[in-house]
Regions:
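Short glycine/acidic-rich loop motifs that flank beta-strands on beta-rich extracellular proteins
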Residues: 1, 5-6, 15-29, 38, ...
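A structural signal for short, hydrophobic beta-strand segments that form beta-sheets
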Residues: 62-68, 99-108, 118
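Extracellular beta-strand/beta-solenoid scaffold signature
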Residues: 22-33, 57-62, 70-71, 126-134, ...
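A generic structural motif
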Residues: 69-75, 108-124
């Protein structure tokens, strides 16, 4: 995935002169970074009137829904992966299992699932409810500073990756939480976040 991304002084807002006609700047997130190689810098920006979150940083994961045989599982298709990728298996609590395996086969399994075959037999502990993480992606290491998030639907910042610093931002009239730290799996809809570790939130203003 892309990495070393910098946004400095960007504005997402209502079109000047059209404020009384159109009250929506975007219908989705202002900035949505997923399945990247991390190192994301967002500073001195103004994000407002989005139809969803101001900033969302995460990697997609897969939810194991069934075991076919000792080397094959079915999971939600939100997991972006290809043959040759290394998958790390996590407990449903996101605790590590110590198990990794390389994908040797991938086919669709219905409209919202994929069937994955691996290069080795999986231990009996890898069962329904486990989380699949593609080690190729890691959106960690992000700096979000001195931005103004205001008057948007949903959250200001949705932080779902590790090694982040969120500092000096101002939040005004966000419909949801100004800063939400979460991992979120809605079966059949989305599966975002690999667990957040080492996140600092400091010197922000909430109104």
């Amino acid at each position: 995935g892309s990495g070393h991304i910098k946004l400095d002084g960007c504005v997402i807002g209502l079109r000047p002169g059209e404020e009384n006609k159109r009250r929506l700047s975007t219908q989705a997130d202002g900035v949505h970074c997923l399945n990247t190689s991390g190192h994301i810098w967002i500073e001195n920006c103004d994000f407002s009137f989005m139809g969803d979150d101001g900033t969302n940083i995460h990697d997609n994961v897969g939810l194991l829904t069934s075991n076919v045989d000792s080397k094959t599982v079915v999971c939600q298709s939100n997991l972006l992966c290809e043959v040759g990728d290394t998958i790390e298996f996590l407990e449903n609590s996101y605790a590590p299992t110590g198990v990794t395996a390389v994908i040797t086969g991938k086919i669709a399994a219905g409209s919202d699932s994929i069937r994955l075959t691996f290069d080795k037999e999986l231990p009996d502990s890898i069962q329904e409810g486990c989380i699949l993480k593609n080690t190729k992606y890691d959106s960690s290491y992000y700096y979000i500073a001195n931005n103004y998030y205001h008057e948007n639907r949903a959250r200001g910042i949705l932080a779902q990756a590790s090694q982040g610093l969120i500092t000096g931002n101002k939040f005004f009239r966000t419909q949801g939480a100004a800063i939400l730290v979460i991992t979120d799996i809605a079966q059949g809809l989305w599966s975002e976040g690999t667990g957040v570790d080492t996140l600092t939130v400091s010197s922000n203003t909430f109104e």
